[in-house]
Regions:
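Pyridoxal 5′-phosphate
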Residues: 1-361
Length: 361
């Protein structure tokens, strides 16, 4: 990335982008390989929310149409559903979770009908280690003939993703989380057979071509969802991050992160004054916990001073889950493949000290 920035400074942005075209093409190809699709099915964005919006706002919806979604849907997605429902008269139906805390497949099957135009699901929520049964939802969507939009922001780079196994029509992701890429990067994958059912909500010189008069033609494939101006240095960095993940192997990454996550979750759960709050029959490396006598922000700051980087859950990021469980905010741990067992042990010891100190007069 620094090499490209220097090249832009030396010869100019247009010229540097032209020289970097091969690297840019590699990014599309790497992302396609990452999710099991084709390069022409990939569109690039500056974040995953813009990628998700480009997909969602391209779905024609009208009065009486139904959007089915889960209780763990990301907050920005929920806001978009609400806005479009107000504009179009479409109906939002929130599918309940089952006893394990994941989307209830039986309830989803019963709620799907001929009015269902979209099933939108967040695969891994920002609020915990739950891994929703995305492939099972895909089978239900396919049988119903509904479009299936999968938010894989917390999934890509953490474990294997295959759009054909999952059965989604649209999938969105980011570069900055488990892919370990630069901030300001996101992508959309669109199944080619879904294109005819979508109407991109922005037409501009990257996404369409003027035919003369009053006509225009959409660009081929997923490029019709892109905009002309891009940060090519970020695109190059994203490609490098994806290539590294592919070289390491997503199966190996998934096994490693899951093992570390389960170890951390189990060890934290044994500590007096600490409760973990991750749901689902399948869980990933995201671990959430509450420390008695400590606010999440205070605990995160204290751990940060010990060079243990964590974050906190924010109610607005998962409003339906917050409403359901009423336990936010929580401390969120996200171990990755490069972390060691010794670092897990040090983290548990630091949390134990925080919990113990909170209980002392």
């Amino acid at each position: 990335m620094t090499t490209h920035l220097q090249l832009e400074a030396e010869i100019g942005g247009y010229e540097a982008a032209t020289r970097a075209q091969e690297q840019i093409d590699v990014t599309y190809a790497a992302l396609a390989q990452l999710v099991g699709g084709r390069s022409d099915e990939v569109a690039l964005f500056d974040n995953s929310t813009h990628a998700w919006n480009a997909a969602f706002y391209s779905i024609p919806l009208g009065p009486g149409d139904r959007i089915l979604t889960g209780r763990d849907e990301y907050g920005s997605n929920v806001l978009a559903y609400l806005q479009v429902a107000q504009r179009s008269g479409a109906e939002i139906v929130v599918v309940p979770n089952d006893g394990d805390g994941q989307i209830d497949l039986s309830a989803l099957t019963k709620l799907v009908d001929e009015r269902t135009k979209l099933i939108g699901l967040t695969w891994v929520p920002t609020s915990g280690g739950l891994v929703n049964p995305a492939a099972a939802v895909g089978r239900i969507a396919r049988d119903a003939g509904a479009l299936y939009l999968l938010d894989a922001t917390q999934a890509v780079g953490q474990f294997p993703v295959d759009v054909n196994d999952v059965g989604c029509d649209l999938l969105t992701g980011t570069g900055r989380k488990f892919l370990r890429g630069p901030r300001g990067t996101g992508f959309l994958w669109v199944r080619d057979t879904a294109l005819e059912r979508l109407d991109p909500f922005v037409a501009e010189i990257r996404s369409a071509t003027w035919d003369g008069g009053r006509g225009f033609t959409w660009a081929d494939g997923a490029r019709r969802f892109e905009t002309w101006e891009n940060s090519y240095v970020n695109i190059i960095g994203l490609g490098a991050a994806v290539q590294q993940a592919l070289e390491l192997g997503l199966d190996a990454i998934g096994d490693r992160t899951r093992t570390l996550g389960e170890r951390l979750r189990e060890d934290l759960g044994r500590l007096p004054g600490v409760t973990t709050h991750d749901l689902g029959t399948h869980r990933c490396a995201i671990v959430t916990a509450k420390i008695a006598g400590r606010s999440a922000d205070d605990a995160a700051a204290a751990l940060g001073r010990a060079s243990i980087n964590v974050s906190t859950t924010v109610a607005e990021h998962n409003p339906l889950d917050t409403e359901e469980r009423g336990i936010h905010p929580l401390v969120r741990f996200s171990p990755h493949y490069y972390n060691t067992e010794a670092e897990i042990d040090r983290t548990v010891a630091a949390v134990a000290e925080l919990a113990s100190a909170a209980g002392r007069p």
